[in-house]
Amino acid sequence: MEVVEAAAQLQTLKFGGSGPGSAASPPPEERPDAEQAEQAPPAGEQPPPAPSSDAGENPPPPSGPCATAPDAAEPLPELQDSDSSDSDSDSETDSDSSSSSSSSSSSSSSCGSLPPVLSDGEEDVQVEKENKNFPLKTKDELLLNELPSVEELTVTLPEDIALKPLGKVSSIIEQLVIIESMTNIPPVNEDTVIFKSDRQAAGKIFEIFGPVAHPFYVLRFNSSEHIESKGIKIKDTMYFAPSMKDFTQYIFTEKLKQDRGSDASWKNDQEPPPEALDFSDDEKEKEAKQRKKSQIQGRKKLKSELNESGEDFGEVHQNWNANSSSEHSKGYHNREFTRGFPRGRYSRGSHGRPPPQQYYNSDPMASQESLGFPPQRQDNPVMPHYPFPPPMFDMHNFPLPPPPPPPPTVSMGWAAPSMTSHPVLNLPYSLPPPPLPPPPPPPSPGESNSSHFGSYY
């Protein structure tokens, strides 16, 4: 509040002493009062003083060159003193305000240091530091610090046991030592003991990665200080004892080639199960595909053979039907109906009773019409060929009924429609039976010569 009041007074004083007389008056320390009085402008030229507390207390003197000059010069030193004091206070207030502003800026900077504002690069560095504290891992993965501590090996090989170089230390990463194997060296398996040049054990192989012909071996230690205590450095040559079966375990590469492997990950970034693995060898994969293809071809061949056997069976059945139909038609193919009389097996009964000569006529149709028989069609005397036998019975073994006996000699006017058909021939089947032969005409009582029928049989 003091600073604000001082600033208000300074504004008031500046407004009151803004006239030309106050600006032209020198400070009292450098000039005497007489000079100030001589240099003071006349009273008529001075502007009226501003309304202030000082002006109210000291009214201006009456006008006059002699009386006003010394009297008017008297309040000027006080005004200059007040102006100088005001300027001093103004400088003090400015210094105070600058100090207060600097203190406020320092306080604001001290307050802003609690939540620092970081740039993008600083944020990335901070995130990386946090990730180092909390590394990413899968569901069942174990970190190095979660593994049990490595046991200390105090094995020293005697001089009579041969050592063979395995590889050189390529890098050291925290608590891991990476060894790059040499060429033409059989690969060794995990838990193989690795020795230094002084025949002391360096550690056991923790993990193997890289190609089979040129693998990389990893030695795990408890910390980086543990590695330094062992005296292991980059480019150091590491050895193994090939003759010691307790310390050295080999990897059989041929067996590895036969195993199935996959580079794909499975659930939770784990290794896939055996049933989901792919072949690691192209030849084995090709052989398996060929075997599967042969199985499919065998199935197709068996199916085609079954289809062919079914077709053969259908062909045999069709041939049997054709043979049976041809044999069935043989019984009727050679039976010709000439002049209404049959040949073959049914002509025996007609030899004993030939018709008389007077009823014989060269025209068979006229003779049949004269006897009252229906005319016989001659356009197709041969029976039609049926491809299949009737379904109800076999016509080969079923005998046809014998022809009806001839009518008596007296009755000559009966006709063929009065004949009763055989009950067996009226069975319901699709193909009609062959028509019955007409009966022979009755013989004449005066003639018994049967030579007329010799030419027909």
Curated annotation (Swiss-Prot):
<feature type="region of interest" description="Disordered">
    <location>
        <begin position="261"/>
        <end position="303"/>
    </location>
</feature>
<feature type="compositionally biased region" description="Polar residues">
    <location>
        <begin position="358"/>
        <end position="370"/>
    </location>
</feature>
<dbReference type="GO" id="GO:1905323">
    <property type="term" value="P:telomerase holoenzyme complex assembly"/>
</dbReference>
<keyword id="KW-1017">Isopeptide bond</keyword>
<feature type="compositionally biased region" description="Low complexity">
    <location>
        <begin position="96"/>
        <end position="110"/>
    </location>
</feature>
<dbReference type="InterPro" id="IPR038664">
    <property type="entry name" value="Gar1/Naf1_Cbf5-bd_sf"/>
</dbReference>
<feature type="cross-link" description="Glycyl lysine isopeptide (Lys-Gly) (interchain with G-Cter in SUMO2)">
    <location>
        <position position="303"/>
    </location>
</feature>
<dbReference type="GO" id="GO:0032212">
    <property type="term" value="P:positive regulation of telomere maintenance via telomerase"/>
</dbReference>
<keyword id="KW-0687">Ribonucleoprotein</keyword>
<keyword id="KW-0539">Nucleus</keyword>
<feature type="region of interest" description="Disordered">
    <location>
        <begin position="1"/>
        <end position="132"/>
    </location>
</feature>
<feature type="modified residue" description="Phosphoserine">
    <location>
        <position position="280"/>
    </location>
</feature>
<dbReference type="InterPro" id="IPR007504">
    <property type="entry name" value="H/ACA_rnp_Gar1/Naf1"/>
</dbReference>
<dbReference type="GO" id="GO:0001522">
    <property type="term" value="P:pseudouridine synthesis"/>
</dbReference>
<dbReference type="GO" id="GO:0006364">
    <property type="term" value="P:rRNA processing"/>
</dbReference>
<dbReference type="InterPro" id="IPR009000">
    <property type="entry name" value="Transl_B-barrel_sf"/>
</dbReference>
<keyword id="KW-0832">Ubl conjugation</keyword>
<dbReference type="InterPro" id="IPR040309">
    <property type="entry name" value="Naf1"/>
</dbReference>
<feature type="compositionally biased region" description="Polar residues">
    <location>
        <begin position="446"/>
        <end position="457"/>
    </location>
</feature>
<keyword id="KW-0963">Cytoplasm</keyword>
<protein>
    <recommendedName>
        <fullName>H/ACA ribonucleoprotein complex non-core subunit NAF1</fullName>
    </recommendedName>
</protein>
<keyword id="KW-0007">Acetylation</keyword>
<comment type="subunit">
    <text>During assembly of the complex, component of the small nucleolar ribonucleoprotein particles containing H/ACA-type snoRNAs (H/ACA snoRNPs) which contains NOLA2/NHP2, NOLA3/NOP10, NAF1 and DKC1/NOLA4. Interacts directly with DKC1/NOLA4.</text>
</comment>
<dbReference type="GO" id="GO:1904358">
    <property type="term" value="P:positive regulation of telomere maintenance via telomere lengthening"/>
</dbReference>
<dbReference type="GO" id="GO:0043489">
    <property type="term" value="P:RNA stabilization"/>
</dbReference>
<keyword id="KW-0597">Phosphoprotein</keyword>
<comment type="function">
    <text>RNA-binding protein required for the maturation of box H/ACA snoRNPs complex and ribosome biogenesis. During assembly of the H/ACA snoRNPs complex, it associates with the complex and disappears during maturation of the complex and is replaced by NOLA1/GAR1 to yield mature H/ACA snoRNPs complex. Probably competes with NOLA1/GAR1 for binding with DKC1/NOLA4.</text>
</comment>
<dbReference type="GO" id="GO:0005732">
    <property type="term" value="C:sno(s)RNA-containing ribonucleoprotein complex"/>
</dbReference>
<feature type="modified residue" description="N-acetylmethionine">
    <location>
        <position position="1"/>
    </location>
</feature>
<comment type="similarity">
    <text>Belongs to the NAF1 family.</text>
</comment>
<feature type="compositionally biased region" description="Pro residues">
    <location>
        <begin position="430"/>
        <end position="445"/>
    </location>
</feature>
<dbReference type="Pfam" id="PF04410">
    <property type="entry name" value="Gar1"/>
</dbReference>
<feature type="compositionally biased region" description="Basic residues">
    <location>
        <begin position="289"/>
        <end position="302"/>
    </location>
</feature>
<dbReference type="GO" id="GO:0042802">
    <property type="term" value="F:identical protein binding"/>
</dbReference>
<feature type="compositionally biased region" description="Basic and acidic residues">
    <location>
        <begin position="327"/>
        <end position="338"/>
    </location>
</feature>
<dbReference type="GO" id="GO:0003723">
    <property type="term" value="F:RNA binding"/>
</dbReference>
<feature type="compositionally biased region" description="Acidic residues">
    <location>
        <begin position="80"/>
        <end position="95"/>
    </location>
</feature>
<dbReference type="GO" id="GO:0090669">
    <property type="term" value="P:telomerase RNA stabilization"/>
</dbReference>
<dbReference type="GO" id="GO:0000493">
    <property type="term" value="P:box H/ACA snoRNP assembly"/>
</dbReference>
<dbReference type="GO" id="GO:0005737">
    <property type="term" value="C:cytoplasm"/>
</dbReference>
<keyword id="KW-0690">Ribosome biogenesis</keyword>
<keyword id="KW-0694">RNA-binding</keyword>
